[in-house]
Amino acid sequence: MAKCDICGKGVGFGKKYSHSHIRTNRQWKPNIQPVKAIVDGTPKKIYVCTRCLRSGKVERAI
C-alpha cells in the first residue's frame, strides 16, 4: 500500500547518523492518501501521494 498508484513513488531507504556517527537504518515514507478517483470512466479507490494530488494528476470522483 505504501506506493503511489500514479507515479510509483515508494519507500526510500538510507541511514540515520547520530552525533557520535553511529549509523542506523531508516526509511522515508511517502505521504500516501486514499482517494476516490475516476479511473477508465468509473470511480475507484486508489492510493495517491500528495504531490500527485496537488499537481492535478488525479481526477477526483464526487
From Swiss-Prot:
NCBIfam families: L28. GO terms for biological process: translation. The keyword Ribosomal protein applies. Belongs to the bacterial ribosomal protein bL28 family. One of its GO terms (cellular component) is ribonucleoprotein complex. The keyword Ribonucleoprotein applies. The gene is rpmB. Gene3D superfamilies: Ribosomal protein L28/L24. It comes from the Bacteria. This is Large ribosomal subunit protein bL28. GO terms for molecular function: structural constituent of ribosome. Keywords: Ribonucleoprotein, Ribosomal protein.
